[in-house]
A protein has these predicted regions:
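Glycine-rich phosphate/ribose-binding loops and adjacent secondary-structure elements
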Residues: 1, 7, 18-49, 55-60, ...
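Non-catalytic terminal/interface segments that mediate subunit docking, oligomerization
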Residues: 184, 195-354
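Context-gated lysine
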Residues: 99, 124, 176, 243, ...
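Conserved short alpha-helical segments that host acidic/polar catalytic motifs at enzyme active sites
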Residues: 1-249, 264
Length: 440
C-alpha cells in the first residue's frame, strides 16, 4: 500500500482501523474515510501493537480493542521511547517532559525531518479530508432501504412442514432451537455440556454442520465480551466486486451494504431484483440451483458440484457480480446439496480461478436453523446467509400459535434474523474477532 502511493499513516489506517462503526461522536469525515476503505479492504483487528517506519517517519498503532500495551516517554533532549512496559530504560524522571500510553485504535507518529510528534487527530483529520469520501459513499454505496419493497410471500403450513421433512427438521429442533429465537430474538439458554454422541460415531443421520466444532481463544488471543464490549464489534459488511486496491475512486465503494450477515427473504428478493431493468450492471445476480439427482448417489453429487463450479465461473465471466447458491425447489428426484459442502466448494473454486473478489456469495438454504450453522457458512466463504426455512418456520409457528405466542409472524422472522446475527457475534467474540469481515 505504501509503495503503491499512499502515505505510511494512510496505509496503517487502512490495515488497522479504529473501531468506527458504533462510535457516535466520531468526526463524520473520519467516519466516511473508514467506511469507504472498509469496502475495499477488510480490517485486521489484532490484538497487536504494530510499529512501522519508512526511514523518515516512525510510529506505532494499537489495535481497535486496545489489547496490547504501549507506553511512551519523551525527554527534554529529544529522546522518545515507546515500549510495552514502563521502566525498560533507566531514565531520569526529571528529564521526562511527556509520557502517556497508546489508546485503542490510536496512532503515535514521529517525523524525523520535522523533528516533532504528529498527533493522532492531526494525522487522521488530514487524511480524511484528502478526498470527498462522504460524497463517494453517497453516490456509490447501495443500502437496503434505498431499494424498492416487494410483496412478501407467505407460505402455507403444509408447505413449511413438507420442506422441514426434506431438510430433516425434528420436533425437538423446532421447539428448542427455532421457537425460542423466533419468540425472543435470542438463542435459547441451556446448560453447559451435551450428551449427544459426536457426529462421527452417531448411528443416526447427522447434518454436515455437526462434524465441526467451535473453538475459543486462549492465552495470546483473548476473547471479547460481546455484550459489554459491543462498541468495538461490527457485523456490517459489503458485497459486490472489489476494485483495484491501489487506485481508489468513487467506483471503489460501488457495493451493497449489509448491516447483518443474515438476510431475510424480502431482502434477498430485493437483491435479486436490483438489476432487473439492467440499470445496475454492477449488481447482476446469478442464481445457482444446489440440487442433485438422488438416484445417482455420491457420483451424481460430485458431478453436480463440479458442474455448479463451472457454471459460476461462466456467470462471473459474463458479468455476474452476486452469486446466489439456492437449494429451493427440491422434490422426490432432486435433493438439496448440503449448503456447507456447496459453499466451501464454490468459494475455493473461485479462489483458485482468481474470481473470488469479483463476486459476492449468498447462500439461500433450508438446512440452517441455528447459530453454529450460520457461523460455519460465513467461515467457509459466504458473504451473507438467507436461512429461508428457519424464517418461514418462525413465521408459521407465530401464525399457528404453536410454541410462539403473542408475536406477529413478521416480528418472528425478524427475531430469527437478529438472533442468528447476534449469535454469530458471540461466536466471533469467543475467538477474539471483532468484525465479521475479519472472521471470514
Amino acid at each position: 500500500l505504501h509503495l503503491g502511493g499512499r502515505t505510511l499513516p494512510h496505509a496503517v489506517m487502512m490495515m488497522i482501523p479504529e473501531s468506527w462503526e458504533n462510535d457516535t461522536v466520531m468526526d463524520p469525515a473520519r467516519r466516511a474515510f473508514y467506511e469507504f476503505h472498509s469496502s475495499i479492504m477488510e480490517a485486521w483487528d489484532g490484538p497487536a501493537c504494530v510499529t512501522f517506519t519508512d526511514g523518515t517517519q516512525i510510529g506505532a498503532v494499537l489495535d481497535r480493542n486496545g489489547l496490547r500495551p504501549g507506553r511512551f516517554w519523551v525527554t527534554d533532549d529529544g529522546l522518545v521511547v515507546l515500549a510495552s512496559e514502563a521502566g525498560v530504560l533507566d531514565l531520569d524522571q526529571a528529564s521526562i517532559v511527556r509520557k502517556g500510553r497508546l489508546e485503542p485504535g490510536r496512532m503515535f507518529l514521529l517525523d524525523l525531518e520535522e523533528h516533532r510528534i504528529i498527533e493522532d487527530d492531526e494525522i487522521k483529520g488530514q487524511l480524511a479530508s484528502e478526498h470527498p469520501y462522504d460524497e463517494w459513499l453517497y453516490s456509490g454505496l447501495v443500502r437496503f432501504e434505498d431499494l424498492p419493497d416487494l410483496e412478501h410471500i407467505v407460505h402455507t403450513h403444509a408447505s413449511v412442514t413438507r420442506r422441514q421433512q426434506v431438510f430433516g427438521y425434528t420436533e425437538e429442533e423446532v421447539r428448542k432451537l427455532v421457537a425460542p429465537i423466533a419468540r425472543t430474538g435470542a438463542e435459547a439458554i441451556g446448560s453447559m455440556g451435551t450428551d449427544t454422541p459426536i457426529a462421527a460415531i452417531s448411528d443416526r443421520p447427522r447434518q454436515l454442520f455437526d462434524y465441526f466444532s467451535q473453538l475459543f481463544a486462549q492465552v495470546t488471543n483473548p476473547p471479547l465480551d460481546s455484550i459489554r464490549e459491543e462498541i468495538v464489534t461490527s457485523l456490517a459488511g459489503t458485497m459486490g466486486p472489489e476494485k483495484n486496491l491501489l487506485d481508489p475512486s468513487p467506483a471503489s465503494c460501488r457495493m451493497l451494504q449489509l448491516p447483518f450477515p443474515v438476510i431475510d427473504n424480502d431482502e434477498l428478493a430485493k437483491i435479486r431484483h436490483m438489476n432487473k431493468d439492467g440499470d445496475m450492471p454492477g449488481f447482476s445476480v446469478h442464481v445457482v440451483r444446489g440440487l442433485y439427482d438422488v438416484a445417482g448417489g455420491g457420483r451424481a453429487l460430485k458431478e453436480k458440484i463440479d458442474a455448479i463450479c463451472a457454471d459460476v465461473s461462466r456467470a462471473v465471466a459474463d458479468g455476474a457480480r452476486i452469486i446466489v447458491l439456492s437449494d429451493r425447489h427440491s422434490n422426490a428426484d432432486l435433493a438439496p446439496i448440503p449448503s456447507l459442502l456447496l459453499t466451501g466448494a464454490v468459494h475455493h473454486h473461485m479462489v483458485r480461478e482468481k474470481l473470488r473478489t469479483q463476486a459476492g456469495l449468498i447462500v439461500e438454504t433450508g438446512d440452517v436453523r441455528e447459530v453454529h450453522h450460520v457461523a460455519l457458512l460465513i467461515g467457509f466463504g459466504a458473504t451473507a446467509v438467507n436461512p429461508y426455512l428457519a424464517l418461514e418456520t418462525g413465521e408459521d409457528l407465530a401464525r399457528e400459535g404453536v410454541f410462539v405466542q403473542g408475536v406477529e409472524p413478521a416480528k418472528a422472522a425478524r427475531n430469527v434474523v437478529y438472533g442468528l446475527g447476534k449469535g454469530v457475534l458471540k461466536v466471533m467474540s469467543k475467538m477474539g474477532v471483532s468484525t465479521v469481515s475479519s472472521y471470514t
